[in-house]
Amino acid sequence: MEQEKWGIVGIGTLGGAILKQLSNGKPNIGFYHPNAEKAAGIAQANPGHQSLTVEELDSFDFLILALPADRLVPFVQSLLDSGLSLTRVTLINMATVVKTAELNRQFPQLRFLGMKFMGHAVDLRERGNGLFITEPNERFASVQERAIRFFEHVGQVIVDKEDVVEEVNSLATRIAVKAAFELEHAIREGGYRQEYASRALVSVAPEVMRAYASGTMGHFARKIVEQLMEEQQES
């Protein structure tokens, strides 16, 4: 059986994280960057992954579009305008706010499949084990199964409505920013140096939340959890 050909476009924070996680014996993937000098640097930093020309994108089975939302449609249109057909390629939409169903309506001759990332790309790059959401798709069920198997090299894949990614990411961002505001205010009100607020925001708080989620909090943090639970029971 001929090996599937996978490519990726958009080597920013998310695309770069995916490339890194597909190293170390995992499937190699071609990547496209319009700047030849930057493409050479990406290839050097990610051994095993090969730089592609724009013409080669038409020959792939799957093409991951790790592009910003406002660049996705113009990029696809530019490929079509250049003479590429893309009819044999399954285009993987990773843009959180771009609806895959709308892409399939806008480009009926093409095949788009959603694979949305829930989380932060920096965390994916450093730790792997990403979480990806793909919406049930009976029309493209066969290629969806193949896409799920591929992304399982990078993390977990859940079949669910893709809107949950934007909803949960927005909820988490809103609560995190609110907590950051409150922490800055508490540090300031306590008369502490501003440097302490910065350290608490970039180091203490994120690691405490990570430990809470994984159940690995230390004794100091667990005592504070107990105090908070007691306060909740009293109120």
Tell me what each language-model feature is.
Residues 36-41, 99-102, 140-143:
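Short, charged/polar "capping" segments at the starts of alpha-helices
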Residues 1-53, 186-192:
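NAD(P)+-binding Rossmann beta1-loop-alpha1 motif at the extreme N-terminus of oxidoreductases
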Residues 106-111, 126-205:
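Internal alpha-helical scaffold of NAD(P)-dependent oxidoreductase catalytic cores
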Residues 25, 45-47, 87, 106-110, ...:
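Short, structured coil segments at secondary-structure junctions
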Residues 58-60:
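Alpha-helix C-terminal capping/helix-to-coil transition sites in glycosyltransferase folds
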Residues 183-235:
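Interdomain hinge/lid region at the active-site interface
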Residues 62-125:
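Rossmann-like NAD(P)(H) cofactor-binding subdomain of soluble oxidoreductases
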Residues 48-56, 158-162:
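Short acidic-hydrophobic, aromatic-tinged amphipathic segments that line or gate anion-handling sites
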